[in-house]
Amino acid sequence: MILSSKASFIHQRIRKNTVFAAFCAIFAAIYEHFSHQVYSPYMICAFLFPVCLGIVPDIIRLKLCKSPKYLQKAGQIYSRHDISHIYEISLVMQQCGIYTFAVGSIFRGILDIYGTTNVLSAVYWWAGAFLFIGGIGINCVRR
């Protein structure tokens, strides 16, 4: 039962990341169209954060979920209820890191298009790295 809810949780994350990646790509296209064809690599590549850090690893997780060896190991790991909550918290932290990376990339792209800089844009990269790596760390410590 917990494994099926885990798979549905991952399916939900894939849908959210797909919608967010599409939003980032459409936002970048519209923003650059109205900025008189001035481009920024940060703006163009913002959609890659949810794709590379969210969708691809989640598809791999789903493929691993279906293997018999993983199901046996997961049955032992998820036999206690509190561990599954820790797993969900780690995935939510990773998701927040992905969103922070993408928003920071869009913000940096906006600054590049306007031809200005801001020291505070580095906060997005540090916060995104902290959240994403922290989520992975919680997941590794749990095992």
Please annotate each region the language model reported.
Residues 1-3, 73-76, 141-143:
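Short, charged juxtamembrane terminal tails flanking transmembrane helices
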Residues 2-5, 62-63:
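C-terminal ends of transmembrane helices
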Residues 5-12, 38, 78-92, 119:
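Juxtamembrane loop-transmembrane helix junctions in multi-pass integral membrane proteins
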Residues 12-34, 41-68, 90-111, 123-142:
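Hydrophobic cores of alpha-helical transmembrane segments in multi-pass integral membrane proteins
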Residues 63-86:
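Flexible loop linkers connecting adjacent transmembrane helices
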Residues 71-75, 118-121, 125:
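Generic alpha-helical propensity signal that fires on short helical segments
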Residues 112-117:
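Membrane-interface helix termini and inter-helical loops of multi-pass transporters
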